[in-house]
Amino acid sequence: EISCEPGTTFQDKCNTCRCGKDGKSAAGCTLKACPQ
């Protein structure tokens, strides 16, 4: 469950995601291959 401020960005492992308008989903994330 994602909880974020709409319009802001947040980290998901090594990727940066933009928060969706509902504050409960990612509108889009960078797709870098994160080291394990």
Swiss-Prot record:
> SUPFAM superfamilies, per this entry?
PMP inhibitors
Quote the subcellular location field of this record. Secreted
The domain of life for this entry's organism is Eukaryota
Q: Does the keyword ATP-binding apply?
A: no
Sorted alphabetically, the keyword list is: Disulfide bond, Protease inhibitor, Secreted, Serine protease inhibitor
Primary residence: secreted
Please report a single Pfam family linked to this protein: Pacifastin_I
Site residues (Reactive bond), renumbered to this chain: L31, K32
Q: What does this protein do?
A: Probable serine protease inhibitor.
Q: Spell out the family assignment given in the record's similarity comment.
A: Belongs to the protease inhibitor I19 family.
Q: What is this protein called?
A: Serine protease inhibitor 2
According to its UniProt entry, this protein's organism is Melanoplus sanguinipes
